[in-house]
Design a protein with these regions (language model features):
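12-transmembrane solute porter fold
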Residues: 1-148, 167-192
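Short, membrane-exposed interhelical loops at transmembrane-helix boundaries
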Residues: 152-168
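Intrinsic disorder in cytosolic terminal tails and internal cytosolic loops
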Residues: 157-160, 190-199
Length: 199
């Protein structure tokens, strides 16, 4: 689910930064690079924290952070300061970094050592499937919402009408927020369930 939500943002962000805000491709790229840069720094730290905290707790914290960033994106307009948008991108990278490492640990800890290769393959499959679903679902929701706001079908950014795109963007990122929220609730249930079993 979280890969689906992440790719909603990956599809929307270039349209917002380049078409709606008028940034050059390299400028938009520099801003979006904050996500992987922060994630690279945070992921190993999150991995080391598993010695002190339950992986389920860390993944829940990461998902809560990711859900909050979706709210930030949902409120973005043409007048939103780019430093604020960049902050949300960095916070999203932080949340993803907190989530990824302990989530992989949880997946791998549920299988025997001889099945680790299969589990790793299934984990990669789930990740790639989430990416594909995220791309297809986000574009479907985006252009359906834009078409509704425009009053007729459209499958591209409408020049000179950033308001149409923003309407579609807000709807699309609202869907992404609910996906993140659902993933958070599922993960929280998993954490509480394991705590009950441990007693």
């Amino acid at each position: 689910l979280i890969f689906v939500a992440n790719f909603f943002f990956n599809v929307i962000a270039p349209f917002y930064l380049q078409n709606a805000r008028g940034l050059m491709p390299n400028e938009a790229g520099y801003l979006l690079m904050l996500f992987p840069i922060v994630q690279v720094v945070v992921s190993p730290i999150s991995g080391s924290l598993q010695n002190r905290f339950a992986p389920e707790l860390l993944t829940t914290v990461g998902l809560v952070i990711l859900s909050i960033t979706q709210i930030g994106y949902m409120t973005a307009t043409l007048s939103t300061p780019l430093w604020l948008f960049g902050t949300w991108v960095g916070v999203m990278g932080f949340g993803n970094g907190v989530f990824q490492s302990p989530n992989n640990t949880i997946v791998m800890s549920t299988v025997s050592q001889r099945d680790l290769g299969v589990a790793g393959g299934m984990n990669a499959l789930a990740r790639n499937l989430g990416m594909v679903v995220g791309i297809s679902a986000s574009t479907t929701v985006l252009f359906a919402s834009m078409s509704q706001a425009y009053g007729k079908p459209t499958t591209t950014y409408i020049a000179g009408r950033p308001d149409i795109f923003l309407a579609g963007m807000h709807t699309t990122l609202t869907v992404a927020f609910f996906i993140c929220a659902l993933a958070t609730l599922i993960n929280l249930w998993r954490y509480l369930h394991r705590r009950v079993q441990a007693k």
